[in-house]
Amino acid sequence: MNDTSDNQSKNADELILSQDIKLIGVDDPKSKDQVFNSAIAALEEQKYDISYELFNYFVESFEDEEKNPLSHFWLGEISLIENDLSKSKDHFMELISSYPNHYRVPLAHKKIGDIYLKSNDVQRAKDKYNFVIREYPNNSASSLALQLLKNME
């Protein structure tokens, strides 16, 4: 019975320590940059599972007006690569709704069109691509959407 109590105490101590470490990192720009840069490095090495975990940790642990939206973008992209379309759409929608003026928003809309296309929802894909062209005519995402529409004809 004493072993059970010791194990519970040890687990509680580990949980508290884990939370303390996480909280220390919240206000530490060096930790923030280290996590984000490690996520990018893993992404570049196509270690998608590691990259996903790091980006996810980043958005759950840090506030950063530039890197949080990028993290959501990359979480959406990794999910799309791994064909988890629902999770991918959720991340792109989070970027769009939480950071509507971020420079990745037009591409996030285009990626949602890609998700519809991969789901064989051709009409919704076309509608989304037309939205990108109409709302962001001077963005490179618009050119990509236009090309995809031409390829669908």
Residue locations for each model-derived region?
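Acidic, polar-rich low-complexity tracts and alpha-helical solenoid repeat scaffolds
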Residues: M1-E153
